Amino acid sequence: MAISFLCFCLITLASLIFFAKKIKHLKWNLPPSPPKFPVIGNLHQIGELPHRSLQHLAERYGPVMLLHFGFVPVTVVSSREAAEEVLRTHDLDCCSRPKLVGTRLLSRNFKDVCFTPYGNEWKARRKFALRELFCLKKVQSFRHIREEECNFLVKQLSESAVNRSPVDLSKSLFWLTASIFFRVALGQNFHESNFIDKEKIEELVFEAETALASFTCSDFFPVAGLGWLVDWFSGQHKRLNDVFYKLDALFQHVIDDHLNPGRSKEHEDIIDSMLDAIHKEGKDSSLELIIDHIKGFLANIFLAGIDTGALTMIWAMTELVKNPKLIKKVQGEIREQLGSNKARITEEDIDKVPYLKMVIKETFRLHPAAPLILPRETMAHIKVQGYDIPPKRRILVNVSAIGRDPKLWTNPEEFDPERFMDSSVDYRGQHYELLPFGSGRRICPGMPMGIAAVELGLLNLLYFFDWKLPDGMTHKDIDTEEAGTLTIVKKVPLQLVPVRVQ
């Protein structure tokens, strides 16, 4: 009898708590939401280019809106003011990450920096990354690698220039950023290693991004294993695991090479730095690293550091070639400032060309490589633009929509670097109308490394070469159609004819 009475009391108490929460939630002022279907929510309203679909929905429902992806509520932010509230005002309360199937797997159960939810372990790893891997001193120590790889690209393009044959600049720039990554992070020379196949690496980057971007039911239908079952039948689990094993084999190979006592060590790379940290374990009790952490960090750099830099350069060259006056102006400044006799560009030359920096800013605005900041998750109740955002709510910031907001930018669809002529707006996370690297505690830690590669790569392309279109093409034929989800590529690869400038 006593047990029955106790059970009755517990059930009654649980019911009261449940309904109290329900009543409290009814009083909340939630963001506006488009009509949704049962079960799937608003998933049917998301097209092949999610950032564009979300932009169009925001134009109708406002810069802060609530969508339902399956059973998961997601708040989408599409204005500078709302982004500032999320990324600065409430940064601490919404700087966690949702635990997704793909990110859990590729980060080796959240042993990385990008995908790990907020907590003491993440704070210690982030501190280590900023102090040891991506600090200014470390970025500068890899300067010779960036300069050598850009010089190698110039030599390759010069050979094509002799024959006046078109080059796939999209592929050339991907290999440039990939070769820099492999030397900086893995200590492997793209051009000398017998282990690394360039074509397979490009394929692996594509597979990894596709697997992460593909619809994973488990993330949106976490009920009674329903999502897991659908993912198993659809092959999504297999795709993610295939990518995981390929990346693991690659990373394990280079880590084993670094652990070889007979290995020659000309320059310290990122794996060396992390292995040193493991050997010194105990001096910093807040940080405990194992080999899985190295692989988690490498996965972050592999996914975020190769494709994004190449895409920024591709979009910049696309817009410049499409606008002959602009490319003439930026090349005129570069060649006037650097002179006509340089055999090799160095990173000291970058500060001499402010117009090129404006071109890069405008590319970040109009063509951010990652149009949606990686999803955040609230850890407490917050208010954004007067709307209530409950705890455990995913938040997406649409930086592409903000970059094309006519309230912020004159003629936002036009590529106009001179809009930054007398502007203090920068891309380092302090100006919320331009957020290619995010902002706040979750800003991309590899930003200095990525910027250095983009600036030097474009400087080489524009100093040493003039660029012509393949026979039969005019500037009007250059399209800017997009493709992709996590990162946005030019749908039709950029084919140009390099003409070496003597």
From Swiss-Prot:
InterPro entries: Cyt_P450, Cyt_P450_CS, Cyt_P450_E_grp-I, Cyt_P450_sf. Belongs to the cytochrome P450 family. Disulfide bonds: none annotated. PROSITE patterns: CYTOCHROME_P450. It is found in: Membrane. The chain crosses the membrane at residues 1-21. Its cofactor is heme. GO terms for molecular function: heme binding; iron ion binding; monooxygenase activity; oxidoreductase activity, acting on paired donors, with incorporation or reduction of molecular oxygen. Heme binds at residue 444. Keywords: Heme, Iron, Membrane, Metal-binding, Monooxygenase, Oxidoreductase, Transmembrane, Transmembrane helix. GO terms for cellular component: membrane. The gene is CYP71B20. It is a single-pass membrane protein. This is Cytochrome P450 71B20. It comes from Arabidopsis thaliana (Mouse-ear cress).
